[in-house]
From Swiss-Prot:
Gene name of the encoded protein: NCOR1P1
Gene3D superfamilies: 1.20.5.430
A Pfam family per the record: GPS2_interact
Family: Belongs to the N-CoR nuclear receptor corepressors family.
Coiled-coil segments on the chain, per record: 68-100
Comp. bias regions, Polar residues: 1-18
Protein name: Putative nuclear receptor corepressor 1-like protein NCOR1P1
Taxonomic classification: Eukaryota, Metazoa, Chordata, Craniata, Vertebrata
InterPro entries, A to Z: N-CoR_corepressor (IPR051571), N-CoR_GPS2_interact (IPR031557)
Keyword NAD found: no
Keywords, alphabetical: Coiled coil
Residue ranges, annotated region (Disordered): 1-68
Length: 102
């Protein structure tokens, strides 16, 4: 174990590749709301985002340099979970779309 508590070549600053697959999603944040397609149902669930909703750490004005390593890791994990949720929602919507157009 290294002095950081992580085994060598592991941890937040590891040179190893992440165990998460790369994402090909491009994130855009339009200033206007798009009208929802009725073919996809009427309900829309906005994902909670640490960037938009809940700040990481106790201080809402905390910059990343003021957050502890553990807090940053928690934030990264939260973002990864949100990405996974959204990807699952996209897959479900694609399946619904295939059913509707077949």
């Amino acid at each position: 174990m290294s002095s950081s508590g992580y085994p060598p070549n592991q941890g937040a600053f590891s040179t190893e590749q992440s165990h998460y697959p790369p994402h090909s999603v491009k994130y855009t944040f339009p200033s206007t709301h798009h009208q929802q397609d009725p073919a996809f149902g009427g309900k829309h669930e906005a994902p909670s985002s640490p960037i938009l909703g809940q700040p990481c750490g106790d201080d809402q004005n905390a910059s990343p340099s003021k957050l502890s390593k553990e807090e940053l890791i928690e934030c990264m994990d939260r973002v990864d979970r949100e990405i996974a949720k959204v990807e699952q929602q996209i897959l479900k919507l694609k399946k619904k779309q295939v059913k509707v157009f077949v």
